[in-house]
Amino acid sequence: MKAMRESPRRLLAPFALLAALSACVRYHPRPLSPRRSAAAFQTRRLDDAKLRVFLSDYGRAPKHWPKRHWNLGDLILVALYESPELAVQRARWQVARAHVITAGERPNPRVGFLSQHHSMAPEGVLPWTLGFSFDIPIETAGKRGDRIQKAEALADAARFQVGETAWQVRVRVRQRFLDLWATTEQARLLKTQAQLRERLLKLVEQRFAAGENSAFAFNSIRLGWRRTQMTLSATEAHVARARAALAQSLGLPLGAIAGLHFDFTNMNHPFAGQYPPLTTLERVALRHRLDLQAALARYSAAEDALKLEIAKQYPDVHLGPGYEWEEGDNRWSLGFSISLPLLNQNQGPIAEAKARVVAAAATFTALQARVIGQVSQATTGYRGALKTLQVTGGLFEAQRKSQRLFEQRFATGKIGLVTLLKERLAFFAAARDRLIALQQAQQALGALEEALQYPFAKSFSLMPAMRHPSPSSLRHTHS
């Protein structure tokens, strides 16, 4: 009888051991509050101490904090620190990295418990048959390794996508910064032109009242003054919109950049060094373009998926050891089972995987062709923009010399004030033409850098975006 009492306890021991060894991850709720996240966004500032640490980590340690002047390189790092789009891509990268862990997990064994009651058991004999059995799966044909390789390739693609998003953040910041600089300069020139036209209009109006000028000349100058005023008003509105667009590209509220001073020095000097051959630029693009690297990683993942489907043709083995106790008799068993590939040999999934490999290869080839075309078009556009800038620069210098000559003639009394004012207006018109050409050259440079995904100024690095997220570089907007 003592043996009968102890045997069921021995049967229950493995289950107690399994329960003790099982480790559980507890769920910690992190509710997302739209109101709090919106309020947190409105509190973002450029004097954030964590932002200062972030800038220092990448070689832009400010001597004075908060900074008094912000240049393009500083603002790009601000955008990499604050960008919501980049935070989304980082989170997706973390999901892909977690999937590598999932892919590497081995299937857990299963345990089953058996109990049978005997209604005809002799007196004094425990009327139960007790036992348990295991199902131990064993993967074959390297399926686990194929899963891991596929997951790692997709994680690489997600990592490259983080860099691609970082580059797009850089492109948007540069475009908005350039737009703000150009519209601010346009407004400054237009304001001076408006003052000159107003002064000229008063002089011509006096002459018209005295009968010294025709009505046509007076109306023509008045119309020019009105058009300048309208253009100035529209440009000033554009300046306000450009500041708002820059704040958005930085991932900041508009109030965070109110009253900020920007350093536009580099905008006046587009890169005009010696260009390498077009084939060299194409090689640079094919080497640096992160979307190409991501497409290549996705192709590798498609190949690994095909290897996995081919490996699934070979069935996994399931070992089934078991134990039963009945009336003092200990019975052990050992069995195994496999799936018989009689009705199908996984042909459908293999065919789908093969088609995905072909599609991934076609996608990569098409992207390569598009990149080469973009580089060719952007290179031609930038060289043309530099030639236009050279021509307008020459005309501007000629107009500058002409104005100096007119200033000298006016000082000696050879010409009147009306003639001098018209010459000054011509000079500022040439200055506006040069500004437009300079803006177009900077836009063309931006298009070339975007096609190459390589900054000519070497003032930007993708490393902040490619690193693993850290507490100092990420914001938590949910509580």
What are these model-predicted stretches?
Residues 2-78, 236-284, 447-479:
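Terminal intrinsically disordered/low-complexity segments used for targeting and assembly
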Residues 58-69, 112-143, 147, 257, ...:
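Small/polar, glycine/serine/threonine/aspartate-rich low-complexity segments that form flexible
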Residues 3, 25, 144, 153, ...:
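Periplasmic alpha-helical coiled-coil/stalk elements that build and connect Gram-negative outer-membrane
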Residues 81-87, 94-109, 121-124, 132-150, ...:
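A glycine-/polar-enriched beta->alpha junction
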Residues 214, 371, 378, 413-416:
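Alpha-helical heptad-repeat coiled-coil segments that mediate oligomerization/polymerization in large
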Residues 235, 290, 437:
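Metallo-beta-lactamase
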Residues 349-352, 362-388, 395:
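C-terminal structural cap/anchor segments
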Residues 208-212, 410-414, 451-455:
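A short glycine-centered flexible hinge/capping loop motif at secondary-structure junctions
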